Structure formats: structure tokens, C-alpha cells
From Swiss-Prot:
Pfam families linked: RNA_pol_Rpb2_1, RNA_pol_Rpb2_2, RNA_pol_Rpb2_3, RNA_pol_Rpb2_45, RNA_pol_Rpb2_6, RNA_pol_Rpb2_7
UniProt cross-references to HAMAP family, sorted A to Z: RNApol_bact_RpoB
Gene: rpoB
Enzyme Commission number(s) from the entry: 2.7.7.6
A single Gene Ontology CC term: DNA-directed RNA polymerase complex
Quaternary structure (record): The RNAP catalytic core consists of 2 alpha, 1 beta, 1 beta' and 1 omega subunit. When a sigma factor is associated with the core the holoenzyme is formed, which can initiate transcription.
Protein's recorded name: DNA-directed RNA polymerase subunit beta
Presence of the UniProt keyword Transcription in the record: yes
Biological processes, Gene Ontology terms: DNA-templated transcription
Organism: Anaplasma marginale (strain Florida)
Lineage, broadest ranks: Bacteria, Pseudomonadati, Pseudomonadota, Alphaproteobacteria, Rickettsiales
Length: 1382
């Protein structure tokens, strides 16, 4: 079977279920294997959590291993983890949606409870009984048991989760990677503009550690953003002394006394830009550089090259230098100068006096090395380790006074214990690479060396070495996917369970305890349920169409727990970054306040095991582009020269040009082609799935491309799907990768096909052996999350041979395996009577008549039957006070029949609710006695269809509580479900039976078996039953053995089919678990047909959106010369200012595609002996230079006619992103189609028949109908709810609100002097409570009196003024009827 790109080979045939290969202008070669599974990001992440990963342990396993064993506080017993087991889901995905339950699997863990023999127990220690043989603790008893710890929501095959019957998606989150980050305030903190540097160590779990300079260049640290302390406190808390700190941060320079001064080693780097106050002399006393001369780095290097290794410093030249270690009087041991102190003139005298011959100085020159750590240390240089620990404790836990051991334990737990602090492997790798460390990856806590190196690097930044980190660089941001989120929640649940187990251990009698007594399965279930139900990243799946599903699963959000908030996110984090290239789409993002915070994964990008996004590139070796594809991280990419995919290469894949533009280090540079390391795999690798579906994307303004990407996700699946004539070649890929189509699991032959099932007999590659039966149950008229219709249709026929991953059934918005969100319509860009003012759209009535944009929407209505204190509610047909005509569409039970046409206020389910008995008046009792009328002691509580819905009932589900008697309708539904199970079972048995009996006949024939009474085997086979066949030829031992083996295999498969069937029936008969007090739930599904009408929103793929203003009769629409009316008129003024020229180019190419199809049709209709030759010749011209040209040449005449007939409606084109056809190529196609190469034609006015003055751009454009339907928005209210405070009607359709009569509307009435209307609007129609009651009374009485009182909003204003201590009183003056405010 061919894909949308076609397949070559001798005798090429286009199958009926294949899409016609597109005429593509792509030059680059796609790596299609990366596109087969677009939702791999979800699946891989979940599999890593639940399955076996690279280390041989899953995420679940590692959590259990970290938690167990659990010991009781006195060490008498221990609860050990042995293993875990994940069960099978109780119901399949379809059944969970239907029942409204969670699709989950039970998790059971095997625990071992060990109790030790003890001699004596005290709070200080436990004395154990020791086994004499092994010299180990003696076990009193050991109990092992498998325990359930709850259910884990399972990911479906579509990458979603079904929670309470609703499909949800866990969106991946972009967050700052664990590790260390260096930053500066960019001079914004202080008015002087001085840069203040800071560093932050971010763990995956645990306390944040910040380091920062202040304006005086003192270094401070903070823990969890609490009060800052000097960094010396932290270093001393780590056990470092003053000398240790100085040794760690400063190099030492040894000064040796000689006759003329101090002899010092000559270090080149110390003389960069230095101006000495004394002459620079060598050890011999020769002056090399005069005093006060600026020494540059070049001079210093020259002096070193000339052999200068030591120089002389005068005795007074050491003034102001910092001593590296204490200088001690050799005779008395008294300290002359303490470590870190500066040398003064007094000190110089003492040094000479005590004959100090050698001094170690700190290498601080105030230019390349500053005294920042030293100054910080001298803030409190006498502080001890204990003082530092207590000071840190006081900041974090103020108000407590603990002992030293508690303080040490607390400090150790902050950063150095894995239970409370976890950098994660990612954090450790980032820390190692940033700081040049070589710490083992499994060390996920901080070390002393880490902290010292962070401070060192911060000091180097202040000294002018290195650069700060870019937090928006994708090397510093990682993706947290679904598996990681669930793992974190799982860990939280297990930790809560651990605490409960430890509490229980302290109070339980061990002799009677079993492992199950310690575990409460609700703990984990509650945590997981909260996450899936209420987390910001667990979202109701966008299921409008297949594209919206795929996009939602590939979405990346910077919001959510541990992420940003939209209010605090600045411009930088939202902006496109150079590292987004090939990783995050620069186009697709929301338009509102979430812009830039929510983005989409680029089409070829994938996420590695550490959560960083990788992009693929083709390796270049010696100017030759190889087929080797390598995935690079953002951090790696900057080191290489990467050329664009559009770089010209010859037939040997060698670069044609000597110089190429490349990306390197975030910039574009021109380099020699020999230096190029990689080349992009495809021009479209920078965009997302949605953006890759926009033809001529490169001709559109980015803002409009963004709208186009977003609006494709809002397109409603139409009644009949139609693939675009002008696509991008990605339509097939997106459809196959979305899960909306049904793909064949294995090679095989279609054995049976109908509207609901496809049965395929699967074979091995050589078609020799049957591997089994694949039964595909199609989704028929199911309701999506957004009320659109999901309906799968088979595209294969009986007997078709299909290969693995072939499309065998289309879904909604799919046409022969290609994504089909809209329709190809004939468009004219012109104005028409002002009806296309401001992007309005004019539509032909013919489009409505042909149901071109008609869509089916499925509404779900639910009726709940409860048990009330007065008795149970009942579903019944005889509803009080309802005439028989209104009940005609209900069955005997009282539930609407499938197929019934229902409209506003139709009863869907008849239901009555008991009410308290009422005492009847005497006259009613008399009537009851005389006529025997039944008095209802119940009220009508039936399910009525809402006023804005009209449609056909397509399905009814009845759920009856287990133990409650089922009604006839639920029994009928159950019987139909069992029938479908029987059908599935029989399909499987039929296929297997047919295969095995064929194999049996072949075996008997090959063995030459003779059957008594038959001349040959064929006549025997024609008459023999299946049972007779199995007993034939058993006299031959070899044949009998083979037959026995075959029979065992056959019986095994048939037995398995029967077992599955019985399992399904048992589950169905088990009944339903309904909420407390609910007896029955009835769900009614109504299919509503939405025709196109004024007010509906439509759009193209280029951000060209508009609302239908008028549906014009087809005869009045402008028409072509042959009388064909245009389908749609767009305003030509909507193109220049929006700069989305792609729609015009699409129109031209669509015009060429249709006219080429018409020309092919004319050749076919003409017939004649030369037809095949003419056809081949014309198709050769169309597909000139295409791979498909050779396929067409290899076609037989019959195959060619089939292919040509499929092209009658138009030749499908592909204009891939950034590789669309140029003007000349479009003009060439227009000329080939024998139409004006300008793409414009003369149109005729349908009303007058006159030709328009000038030519008009006409062609075919792909238009989408969006989910903003006027039927869902139109709303009216007469009486409804009012606001509690203002007493004004609520607003909006969802609240059944009124229309706001605002300030400007009041001005309009004032302008016309409509005083009474204005008064009415502001009082009785709004918030005059007394007035509206009086109006109601006067209407009932038939009066025309009109009285209005004080509006409630006035009272609210008075109350607000009183709250400001302004007493406003309304006084009634005797002389005046109006009130005055005092």
C-alpha cells in the first residue's frame, strides 16, 4: 500500500483506500520514522515510570526501594518490600467512558513482616536474641503477604487518561532545570548601575540555596529566600577554618627577603594593566620599567620571554598587601600579623626587627582578584562552627532553642541527606559541567566542594571572568512529562503511607499483625485522584478534531505547580530564543495572556531521558551530507556549525557552494563548507505539527500564521470529509500519528468488513503462516469532549491485502488517511454589496444545499433516578399532566426510542418523584368518587430537551444499580451488547476455523490420504463436515501426529475466544456501581445537525477568519464564463494589511489543480485509440521531475485509467513549509491547465448578467468551519435569575442572563429624549424590586399603570457611601413629590 507520498515499483497500482499521491515541491528528504508516532512524548514518559527502564528498574520500583524497609521506633520489627505487581484493567477504555469510571489498574505489593526476638527493650537500646549458628539476630516470626495499595490510572493507547469517564491529558511542563545558575541584576538594583552578581543552587526537591553580593561587595547567602547571612557562616558551618577558607579562595605568593628588598616570582597575569609606584627591577638591580609606567599584558609577556622570572620589590612595597598566614615571632610565639590582615608601616618595622625572611601573601591585586571573600570573613572572623550552625538555625527556625546535636542534624538534613534533598541526576550533571567537577552522577546531594566551587565561580564573575547564565536557554530548561508528574505524586502518597505505617507500628500488637493491617489503600488513591482531577496540568482534552488532540498532547506549558505564573512572567521568558530552533515552535502559541508561556513541541524534536529537548541533524563529513542522523541538545548545538536544509548539494550529496551561512553559538556566520559539521534534516523542523499543515507558510506574516495554527484546532469535523487540494504533504503523517485513523497492526487479508468491524486474517511476511486474527471495533457516532462526532469508516474492501501500519479505517475529519479539516471551495476575492465589510464572508446558497459545511454534533443528556425519603423515583410513561401526543416517542418503559426526532421541550425520559400527600378539597374528593379519577401523589420530574436543541436520538444507555431490578429497556440494551460480543467471538472463530481447515485439507492432500467410498479427495472435501475432516487419515501415524498438533492449536485458540466472551458477559452481568442513593442513570445521546448559517465563523489556514454575513441565492452570486457560480466571496482588502499572501498563492495553485483535473477529465471523456498515450503524455508534463513520474510510466492501462479518474476533481498538490512552489512554477501549471497564468478571470454579476469591469482573482481555497457556531451563542431571556447584591439580571448565556444596557446605550436614549423608555430600562427592567412586582401585577390584571421605585443600585451606592462614613439620607419634602438627597 502506498503512503501519501506514493511508492515506486514495477506495475504501480493505486489502491482504492489510498490517497492520491501529491504533486510535491519538497526538495529535502523527510525522516519519516520520527513522525510515525506524534504522541510518543506521552507514551515514553509513562512507560519509563510504569515499565522497565534502562537500569532494569521502573520509577515505581525505585520509590518502593527508597521507602522500604520500615522499622518500628524501637527496632523490634521491620516491614520489607519484596516486589510489586500491576494487574489488568477491569474494563476497557470504551467501557470506562461509557460507565463514567476511571481507566485504571490495581497495584499490589508483596510485603514481608519480620519480628525479631528481643531480650530487653528500653528507649536507649534494644537487646536482641542472637542466633548461635549464624551470629545474627534471631527471627521470632516472618509473615509475607500480597497487599493492594490502590489503583493507578492507566494511559490509553491514544496517550490520554480516562478519569471518571472523561478523557484528560497531562500537559508537559517546561521548568528551570535543577543545577546551579549564575545571574546579575543588569545594573537595575542601584542607581549607580553597578552589576550585582548572584548564584542559585536549585534542587529537584529540597531547599534553595542563594548566594549574592551586596553594594559593598560582601558575599551573602540565603536558604529558601529567608534572611541573608554572610557566606563565611555557611563555610564555617561546613567545618572550614579561617585559614581553610583563605586557602580555598586565594593563591599564595611567596615574598623572600634579600638585601635590596623582597624577591618575588614574576607572574604575567598579575601585571595586566598595572601601574607600579616603584621601578620594576630584576634581582640584579637593573631597572626594567620606570615607576608610574602602565604595564600592559604585551609588555609583561615580553619581559617573561626575555627571561624575567623574579623581580624586586622595595621593603615598603608590601604595604597594603594581605598576609596569607599568621606571622609569628620565632622567639616568643606572639602573632605579629594575623592571617588576612594588611601590612602597615608599623608592621614593616616589626618584620625587620624580628628578622622575618619569608612571607606568604594572598594573591589579591584589586584588578583581576578582589578581596571579597576576605572582607566577608572579617565581618566576624572569630566565629566558630557551632556559632555559625546556631545562627543559621535561628534564621530558619526562629523562636526555638535546641541543643547542638539537633542543630547539626538539622543543618545536615538541609543539603546533605537524600531523604530531604535531591538534586536528581540532571542536577548533578549540570552542577558537574558548570563547575568542572567530577562527582559521581548518583551523588544527588550537595557536597562541601560544590558549595566552595559555586562561591569561587561567583567571585570570578565579580572579577570579570566568565559570563552569567541565560535562564531562557533550553540547556537550562527541561521538560517534566506525565511519567515524572505521576512518579512525584506516587512518592507523596507512599511517604504518607510510610508515616501511617510507622504510627500504626508504635501501637499494634505484633503477634497478631499481618502486612495488610499496616497498609491503607485509600491514601495513594486519594493523592492520585487529586492530581488527575484538579492539577493545573491535568486538562480536559481538546477533542474538537484529530489535530487538536495531537497538539494538546504535544503542548509544553511554563505554568503550573513549580512553574511560572502568567502575572509575573516577563517578556524575556515569553520570547522566542535561538535555542528554540528545531525544538519549540516559534509560531504556535495562544494569543492572550498566556502568549509564549504555552508552546508546542517542534515536529521532529524529541525529549531525552533527562528531560532536555533534542533536535535532529544530518552529519556532514568532508563537505558530504551523510544519511546519518544525530540528535543534539541545545548546549551541544552552539559548539557546531550547522547549515540550513536549503543548502545546495549535488547528486553525490556534496555541497555546491564553497561558503555557507551557518548557525553557530546562537548567531549566523559565513563559513567554509569544509567547516560545516551538520545540516538541518528538513526546513520544516522548526515548526510544530499544526504550523506544518499551512501551505505557503513562508509567505504569511507570523501573527497570521499563529492564528492559522490555532484556528485549525477549532475546525469542526464535517459531514463528509474532503482532503485539501493544496496541502503540505503532512496531512497523511498527522492523521496516522494522531490515533484518529485505524492502522493495521500486522500484515494480512481483510476477511470481513462492515460498518462496525474490520476482521483481518494476519499472516507472516511470506504469507505462509496465519499469525492470528485481528478484530478492529470501529468507533461509531461517539461524542467527543467538545460534542463533535467521532465516527470511523472502513476504507478497505473484502479480500484486500494490507500491510502493517496501513490505514484501514478513516476517522472524523480524515479522508483516505489524510487529515481533512475543511472543504475546497471556489473563491472570488472581491467586494459584494458591502456584505463582506470587516472580514465578513458571503456564501452561496448552493453550499448550504449541498451540505458542504454541515456538521453533526452529539449532545448528551442525563437523567438520574434517586431513592428519596418518600420513596424511590420511577421511570414511567404515564407522566402527570402530559398529553399522549407528547409521549408518543417514548417506549413502554418511558425512555425515548432510538431514531426519534426530538425538538425543544420533548420528553427524553419520563420520570416521577413522590411528594408528600396533600389534603384534597371536598369538591375534588366528590369528582374522584364520581368519575374514579386517579389522583397523582407524585410530581413530574422528567428529563426534557433544552430549548435550543433539535435532533435525532442516536443512542441510549441505561445503568441500573447492582441489586436493583432491571427494566425492559436495560435488558434490551444488555442483550444487544451480548449480541455484539457473540459477533466478535464468531468472527474470530470463523477466521481461525477457515484457516485451520484449509491447512488440514492441504496436509491430507500432500500425505496422499485415501478415503473409502470416494474416488478423490476433492469430492470428499466437498461433502465432509468439519468434524469429519479432523478424524480423517488418522491411520497414518505421521499424519495423525500432525493433525493432533493442529487440533490442539485450534482448540486452544477457540477456547481462548470463548473465555474472552464469557469474561465480557460476566462483567456486563455484574452490574453497575452507582453513587449512594442513585438507583438508575439514563444517558440519552442526541445528534444535532448544524447547517451553515449567518453568524457562523469560518477561516482559512492562513489566519484569514471571518463571520458569515449573508447566504446569497446561487443564481445571484457572481459566476464564471461557463455559468459556474462562486461558492464564497472574501474581501480583497483583508489581504494587504494582514500580509498573509499565502491564501492568494493557495488560491492560484488550487485553481491550477482543479483545471488540470478538468483537462484530464476531457481527455478521458474524449476517448479514442490515442487516449492512453495522450493521458500518459499529459501526466508526464504535470509530474515532470517528480518521483511519481516513474510510477506512472510503470502503470498498466487499467491502472492508469483508475489513477486518472481519481484526478478528475483536481490534482492534489503539496506545498511544504518553506519549500512551496515559486511564482514561475505556479504560472507553468496554470498554462498547462490552459487558463490565464495571472490566476484571474472575468466574472459576471449573477443579478444583472453583466461582466465585471476587470479581472478578479478566482480559485480554490481550503476553508474551515470553526467551533464558534451561532446556534451555541444566540440567547434570549424573559424571566431569570438576579444578582444578590445589585438585584440586576445576571449576564451571559451560561447564567441565563439578560442583555446589558450600558452607559453608551443610555446616551443613545438620552440623545433621542426617550425619557420613559430610559426610566423603564434603568428601573423596572433592571433592578427596581418593588417596581417589577407591581408591573407584573398590572400585566396580570390587564392594567396599563406604570410605577417605578428606587433602583437597588442606588441603595448599594448609599451603603458604600455609608461605609466611607458619609451618612446619606433620603428626605421626603412635603412641598415636593420628588426626593432630595441631603
Amino acid at each position: 500500500m502506498s503512503s501519501a507520498g506514493g511508492s515506486s515499483g514495477p506495475g504501480y497500482v493505486l489502491n482504492d483506500f489510498d490517497a492520491v499521491p501529491r504533486l510535491s515541491y519538497a526538495k529535502s528528504i523527510d525522516i519519516r520514522d520520527s513522525l510515525t508516532d506524534l504522541i510518543r512524548i506521552q507514551r515514553d514518559s509513562y512507560d519509563a515510570f510504569i515499565g522497565i527502564d534502562r537500569d532494569g528498574s521502573s520509577g515505581i520500583q525505585s520509590i518502593f526501594e527508597a521507602m522500604f524497609p520500615i522499622r518500628d521506633l524501637l527496632g523490634r520489627a521491620v516491614l520489607e518490600f519484596v516486589g510489586y505487581n500491576i494487574g489488568e484493567p477491569q474494563y476497557d477504555e470504551y467501557e470506562c467512558i461509557k460507565r463514567g469510571i476511571t481507566f485504571s489498574v490495581p497495584i499490589r505489593i508483596t510485603l514481608r513482616f519480620v519480628v525479631w526476638k528481643v531480650q530487653e527493650v528500653s528507649f536507649k537500646e534494644v537487646k536482641y536474641v542472637v542466633d548461635e549458628d549464624t551470629s545474627e539476630r534471631s527471627v521470632k516470626y516472618m509473615k509475607e503477604q500480597e497487599v493492594s495499595i490502590g489503583d493507578l490510572p492507566m494511559m490509553t493507547s491514544y496517550g490520554t487518561f480516562i478519569i471518571n469517564g472523561i478523557e484528560r491529558v497531562i500537559v508537559s511542563q517546561m521548568h528551570r532545570s535543577p543545577g546551579v545558575f549564575f545571574d546579575s541584576d543588569k545594573g537595575k538594583t542601584y542607581s549607580s548601575g553597578k552589576l550585582i552578581y548572584s548564584a542559585r543552587v536549585i534542587p529537584y526537591r529540597g531547599s534553595w540555596l542563594d548566594f549574592e553580593f551586596d553594594i559593598k561587595d560582601i558575599i551573602y547567602f540565603r536558604i529558601d529566600k529567608k534572611r541573608k547571612l554572610p557566606v563565611s557562616y555557611l563555610l564555617k558551618a561546613l567545618g572550614m577554618s579561617n585559614n581553610d577558607i583563605l586557602d580555598a579562595f586565594y593563591d599564595k605568593v611567596i615574598y623572600t627577603r634579600c638585601d635590596k628588598g623582597w624577591r618575588v616570582p614574576f607572574i604575567v597575569d598579575r601585571f595586566k594593566g598595572v601601574r607600579l609606584s616603584y621601578d620594576l627591577m630584576d634581582v640584579d638591580g637593573s631597572v626594567l620599567v620606570k615607576a608610574n609606567t602602565r604595564i600592559t599584558l604585551r609588555i609583561a609577556k615580553k619581559l617573561y620571554a626575555d627571561g624575567l622570572r623574579e623581580y624586586m620589590v622595595p621593603f615598603s612595597g608590601i604595604t597594603g598587601m594581605f598576609v596569607a598566614a599568621d606571622l609569628v615571632d620565632p622567639s616568643s610565639g606572639a602573632v605579629i600579623v594575623s592571617a588576612g590582615e594588611t601590612i602597615t608601616s608599623e608592621h614593616i618595622v616589626k618584620l625587620e626587627l624580628f628578622d622575618i625572611s619569608e612571607i606568604a601573601f594572598l594573591n589579591i591585586d584589586f584588578l583581576t582578584v578582589g578581596p571579597y571573600v576576605l572582607n566577608t570573613l572579617f565581618l566576624d572572623k572569630n566565629m566558630t562552627q557551632e556559632d555559625a550552625l546556631f545562627e543559621i538555625y535561628r534564621v530558619l527556625r526562629s523562636g526555638e532553642s535546641p541543643n547542638l546535636d539537633a542543630v547539626k542534624s538539622f543543618f545536615k538534613g538541609l543539603f546533605f541527606e537524600s531523604e530531604r534533598y535531591d538534586l536528581s541526576v540532571v542536577g548533578r550533571i549540570k552542577l558537574n559541567s558548570h563547575l568542572g567537577l567530577d562527582v559521581d552522577e548518583n551523588t544527588t546531594v550537595l557536597t562541601k566542594e560544590d558549595i566552595v566551587q559555586v562561591v569561587k565561580k561567583l567571585v570570578l564573575l565579580r572579577d570579570g571572568e566568565g559570563v552569567v547564565d541565560d535562564i531562557d536557554h533550553l540547556g537550562n530548561r527541561r521538560v517534566r512529562s506525565v511519567g515524572e508528574f505521576i512518579e512525584n505524586q506516587f512518592r507523596i502518597g507512599i511517604l504518607r503511607l510510610e508515616r501511617m505505617i510507622m504510627d500504626y507500628m508504635s501501637s499494634v500488637n505484633f503477634d497478631n499483625a499481618m502486612p495488610c493491617d499496616f497498609v491503607n489503600p485509600k491514601v495513594l488513591a486519594t493523592v492520585l485522584k487529586d492530581f488527575f482531577s484538579s492539577s493545573q496540568l491535568s486538562q480536559f482534552m481538546d477533542q474538537t478534531n484529530p489535530l487538536s488532540e495531537v497538539t494538546h498532547k504535544r503542548r509544553l506549558s511554563a505554568l503550573g505547580p513549580g512553574g511560572l505564573t502568567r502575572e509575573r512572567a516577563g517578556f524575556e521568558v515569553r520570547d522566542v530564543h535561538p535555542t528554540h530552533y528545531g525544538r519549540i515552535c516559534p509560531i504556535e502559541t495562544p494569543e492572550g495572556q498566556n502568549i509564549g508561556l504555552i508552546s508546542s513541541l517542534a515536529i521532529y524534536a524529541k525529549i531525552n531521558k533527562y528531560g532536555f529537548i533534542e533536535s535532529p541533524y544530518r552529519k556532514v563529513e568532508n563537505r558530504v551530507v551523510t544519511d546519518k542522523v544525530e540528535y543534539l541538545l541545545a548546549m551541544q548545538e552552539g559548539d557546531y556549525y550547522i547549515a540550513d536544509a536549503g543548502a545546495a548539494i549535488d547528486e553525490n550529496n556534496r555541497f555546491v557552494d564553497d561558503m555557507l551561512y551557518c548557525r553557530h553559538g546562537g548567531n549566523f556566520v559565513m563559513v567554509k563548507s569544509e567547516d560545516v559539521d551538520y545540516v538541518d534534516v528538513s526546513p520544516k523542523q522548526i515548526v510544530s505539527v499544526a504550523a506544518s499543515l499551512i501551505p505557503f507558510l513562508e509567505n504569511n506574516d507570523a501573527n497570521r500564521a499563529l492564528m492559522g495554527s490555532n484556528m485549525q484546532r477549532q475546525a469542526v469535523p464535517l459531514l463528509k470529509s474532503e482532503a485539501p487540494l493544496v496541502g503540505t504533504g503532512m496531512e497523511f503523517v498527522v492523521a496516522a500519528g494522531s490515533g484518529a485513523v485505524v492502522l493495521a497492526k500486522r500484515d494480512g487479508i481483510v476477511h470481513r468488513v462492515d460498518g462496525s468491524y474490520i476482521v483481518i486474517r494476519a499472516f507472516d511476511a511470506n504469507k505462509d503462516e496465519c499469525l492470528g486474527v485481528d478484530i478492529y471495533r470501529l468507533r461509531k457516532f461517539q461524542r467527543s469532549n467538545h460534542n463533535t462526532c467521532i465516527n470511523q469508516r472502513p476504507v478497505v474492501k473484502l479480500g484486500d491485502y494490507v500491510k502493517a501500519n496501513d490505514v484501514i479505517a478513516d476517522g472524523s475529519a480524515i479522508d483516505r488517511g489524510e487529515l481533512a479539516l475543511g472543504k475546497n471551495v471556489l473563491v472570488a476575492f472581491m467586494s459584494w454589496q458591502g456584505y463582506n465589510f470587516e472580514d465578513s464572508i458571503v456564501i452561496s446558497s448552493d453550499v448550504v444545499k449541498r451540505d458542504v459545511f454541515t456538521s453533526i454534533h452529539i449532545e448528551e443528556f442525563e437523567c438520574v433516578v434517586r431513592d428519596t425519603p418518600l420513596g424511590p423515583e420511577k421511570i414511567m410513561r404515564s407522566v402527570p399532566d402530559v398529553n399522549e401526543e407528547s409521549l408518543s416517542h417514548l417506549d413502554d418503559v418511558g425512555i425515548v426510542n432510538i431514531g426519534a426526532e426530538v425538538s425543544a421541550s420533548s420528553i427524553l425520559v419520563g420520570k416521577v418523584t413522590p411528594r408528600p400527600p396533600v389534603s384534597l378539597p371536598p369538591e375534588t374528593k366528590l369528582l374522584v368518587t364520581i368519575f374514579g379519577e386517579k389522583v397523582f401523589d407524585c410530581v413530574d420530574s422528567s428529563l426534557y430537551l433544552p430549548p435550543d436543541v433539535e435532533g435525532t436520538v442516536i443512542d441510549v444507555h441505561v445503568f441500573v444499580r447492582r441489586g436493583v431490578e432491571e427494566n425492559d429497556r436495560s435488558l434490551l440494551i444488555k442483550q444487544s451488547e451480548i449480541s455484539s460480543f457473540v459477533k466478535e467471538r464468531d468472527y474470530e472463530i470463523d477466521v481461525v476455523s477457515e484457516y485451520f481447515h484449509d491447512e488440514l485439507r492441504k496436509l491430507l492432500r500432500n500425505a496422499g490420504v485415501k478415503v473409502k467410498g470416494y474416488s478423490d479427495l476433492d469430492s470428499f472435501f466437498a461433502e465432509a463436515s468439519d468434524d469429519t475432516l479432523w478424524s480423517t487419515g488418522l491411520a497414518d501415524a505421521k499424519v495423525a501426529a500432525k493433525v493432533k498438533d493442529m487440533r490442539e492449536r485450534f482448540d486452544s485458540i477457540v477456547g481462548e475466544a470463548h473465555r474472552k466472551f464469557e469474561q465480557k458477559v460476566d462483567k456486563l452481568n455484574y452490574g453497575y456501581d452507582l453513587p449512594q442513593g442513585v438507583l438508575t442513570i439514563v444517558k440519552v445521546f442526541v445528534a444535532v445537525k448544524h447547517n451553515l448559517q449567518p453568524g457562523d465563523k469560518m477561516a482559512g489556514r492562513h489566519g484569514n477568519k471571518g463571520v458569515i454575513s449573508r447566504i446569497v441565492p446561487a443564481e445571484d452570486m457572481p459566476h464564471l464564463e461557463d455559468g459556474t457560480p462562486v461558492d464564497i466571496i472574501l474581501n480583497s482588502l483583508g489581504v494587504p494589511s494582514r500580509m498573509n499572501i499565502g491564501q492568494i498563492l493557495e488560491t492560484h495553485l488550487g485553481w491550477a489543480a482543479v483545471n488540470l483535473g478538468k483537462k484530464i477529465g476531457r481527455i478521458l471523456d474524449k476517448g479514442g485509440p490515442s487516449m492512453i498515450a495522450d493521458l500518459r503524455d499529459f501526466l508526464d508534463k504535470i509530474y515532470d521531475g517528480q518521483k511519481l513520474k516513474s510510477d506512472i510510466a510503470s502503470m498498466s492501462s487499467e491502472a492508469l485509467l483508475v489513477f486518472a479518474n481519481r484526478l478528475r476533481k483536481g490534482v492534489p498538490m503539496a506545498a511544504p513549509v518553506f519549500e512551496g512552489p515559486k511564482d514561475a512554477q505556479i504560472s507553468k501549471l496554470l498554462e498547462l491547465a490552459e487558463v490565464d497564468p495571472s490566476g484571474q478571470v472575468y466574472l459576471y454579476d449573477g443579478r444583472l448578467g453583466k461582466k465585471f469591469d476587470r479581472k478578479i482573482t478566482v480559485g480554490y481555497i481550503y476553508m474551515l468551519k470553526l467551533h464558534h457556531l451561532v446556534d451555541d451563542k444566540i440567547h434570549a431571556r424573559s424571566v431569570g435569575p438576579y444578582g444578590l447584591v445589585t438585584q440586576q439580571p445576571l449576564g451571559g448565556k451560561s447564567h441565563f442572563g439578560g442583555q446589558r444596557f450600558g452607559e453608551m446605550e443610555c446616551w443613545a436614549l438620552q440623545a433621542y429624549g426617550a425619557a420613559y423608555t430610559l426610566q423603564e430600562m434603568l428601573t423596572v427592567k433592571s433592578d427596581d424590586i418593588v417596581g417589577r412586582v407591581k408591573i407584573y401585577e398590572s400585566i396580570i390584571k390587564g392594567d396599563s399603570n406604570f410605577e417605578c421605585g428606587i433602583p437597588e443600585s442606588f441603595n448599594v451606592m448609599v451603603k458604600e457611601l455609608r461605609s466611607l462614613c458619609l451618612n446619606v439620607v433620603l428626605k421626603q419634602d412635603k412641598e415636593f413629590t420628588s426626593g432630595e438627597v441631603e
